[in-house]
Amino acid sequence: MEGEKLRVTVKPGEYVYLDLSKRYFPLPGEVSSAGLGEPIITPEKVHLPVHCGDVDQGGKPGVAWDFNLLSLDGYSPETGWIRIDTSKLASIHIASLEKRRSVQRKASKSKKAGRVLAKYSKRERNRAGKHQLEIARVVQSVCGSVGLEELEKQGMYTRSRIWNRRISRGDWRSITRILVGRLGEAGVKELDPYGSSSYCSKCGWFNRDLNGADVFVCGGCGLRLDRQLNAAINLYMRMRFGYTEKWVGGRKRVELRMEGASRVAWWDRVVLPSLVGGCVLTGAERSDPDELVRGLHDAVRPKLHYAYDRYADAYLRIPT
């Protein structure tokens, strides 16, 4: 974009300029080359895909979500940190596994055992499906557009039997399919999950020694933040700015398209106020009235926290 004109490269060194000053639609205030798709030119019309931000027609903000084994963590500057406790969904799979294990060895030799095994499997699908629908309802109620990790289980299996069982019980793809069915493909953007937990959301430093730690510690800027929250912020930035995938020294690297803007300055201006509410927090489980919080990890808690209520048989917001 050059002012009100769109420059289209015909071949190296030769351009065609399209005047957009008389268009009937507004362009986003921060539109750039990264926010424009490839023009489709026909003899009658020019089709120009434009990224219109992360707020849908209903006014709800776009939220990026990080899938975990026992929780679903989301983030946007408008909502802050959102956490949905999915431990009840995981417990359904665990309980069903224990029941199936008792009859699975007999299923190949006994028709009755086979019918019992099929009954247990169907019951598990029905119960898990109900929770998946409830979780998707909560996601849909708090945000407009959705950014989700494009996870593939086949690439996550290891030699550990316990870990493989945990991964096989994941309901990520099922929840994604439900959201796509409700919001449409335009409302759900699948993001590359590579390094979302390992990159520092503030400065981009890569932590090679995370090793399942609950707290992300940055060796570049000193940031200490909940691991899941750091991943959700990284995914939100990929959804908002876009990203490119590169291979450097035989390693994959995901880089944001921030058009030369300072990542640290944007984080301090946009992300930090959304985490601490615009004020300086001075305590979290203090042993002394004058003891200061040691970092963001000690002060920041989810602003919206949802969990399963067995009396209401639904996922409800709980105090944070």
Indicate residue ranges for each PLM-predicted region.
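Acidic carboxylate diad motif detector
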Residues: 1-41, 86, 169, 173
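Positively charged, helix-rich recognition surfaces that bind polyanionic ligands
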Residues: 44-320
